[in-house]
Amino acid sequence: MFDFMTLEKVREKGPLVHNITNIVVANDSANGLLAIGASPIMASAKEEMDELAKMADVLVINIGTLDGELVTAMKIAGRAANVAGTPVVLDPVGVGATSYRRKVVQELLAEIQFAAIRGNAGELAAIAGEAWEAKGVDAGVGSADVLSIAGKVANEWSTVVIISGEVDVISDGTRFAKVANGSALLPRITGSGCLLSAVCGSFIAVQDDAFRASVEACASYAVASEYAEMELERKLPGSFRPLFLDALASWSVEKTRAKAKIQESGEHK
């Protein structure tokens, strides 16, 4: 099912990815999108959200650094994107960390139809209402079944769920996939998950099947990180970061096909 040609579509079409993101990761997210062939715009003024919704091929909302004005812009942008038929991706950074973040995410979910939600296990557990020990914006620890969490959130909100971690889990509520690739250095550079959300958005922008797009995005991203790690003399995050950007720019369909470890299944009980 997965031929990984979505990457080539991104490069051919250069989708415009509108990011309302956090101040920590904006630069890396923009550079990562440029590396894969997408066209990023980082804009958050509420006055221009309606216009941008008509221009963009996808909207990626990231709640990493929140304030009231930004939340207003997110809601305006998301509603306008829905009207325009533009897919919207949510990255609920640290949603389980504070009551304010939980409130904002619930409001966003109630007001906007999302094509995909990408987060770590702790973040998706918080949305699912499952017990999980949050650690700020990090995944933390918990005993709930990750596949069940993915399916529950996907079905409740009619979306594709991407839970990233040592093994990525992707589900649309009916189909499930695991991607068992990725460098151990990814969690050691800030914003690697946020960039993955943006990459998933760029794939969804050019592929009608958001589940397929998300699986191929996760696999391509993870395989690129493995190639970057192979180039390192010393396995340190500061050296890994620029090599990963280079790997994103030079990754190929053939490399992903050769190394991708994907396990797909039907409905999870």
From Swiss-Prot:
**Transmembrane feature ranges:** none
Reaction(s) catalysed by this chain, per the record, are:
5-(2-hydroxyethyl)-4-methylthiazole + ATP = 4-methyl-5-(2-phosphooxyethyl)-thiazole + ADP + H(+)
Q: Which InterPro entries match?
A: Hyethyz_kinase (IPR000417), Ribokinase-like (IPR029056)
EC number(s) given by UniProt: 2.7.1.50
Specify whether Magnesium is a keyword of the entry. Answer: yes
Recorded superkingdom: Bacteria
Please provide an example of a Pfam family that matches this protein in its UniProt record.
HK
Q: Which keywords appear in this protein's UniProt record, sorted alphabetically?
A: ATP-binding, Kinase, Magnesium, Metal-binding, Nucleotide-binding, Thiamine biosynthesis, Transferase
Amino acids binding substrate: 42, 191
The residues the record assigns to binding ATP are 118, 164
Q: Which cofactor does it need?
A: Mg(2+)
Alphabetized GO MF terms: ATP binding; hydroxyethylthiazole kinase activity; magnesium ion binding
Tell me yes or no: is Transferase among this UniProt entry's keywords.
yes
Pathway listed for it is: Cofactor biosynthesis; thiamine diphosphate biosynthesis; 4-methyl-5-(2-phosphoethyl)-thiazole from 5-(2-hydroxyethyl)-4-methylthiazole: step 1/1
One GO biological-process annotation of the entry reads:
thiamine diphosphate biosynthetic process
Kind of enzyme, top EC level?
Answer: transferase
The record's family statement is:
Belongs to the Thz kinase family.
Q: What does the UniProt function comment say about this protein?
A: Catalyzes the phosphorylation of the hydroxyl group of 4-methyl-5-beta-hydroxyethylthiazole (THZ).
* Name used for this protein in its record: Hydroxyethylthiazole kinase
Organism the protein comes from: Listeria monocytogenes serovar 1/2a (strain ATCC BAA-679 / EGD-e)
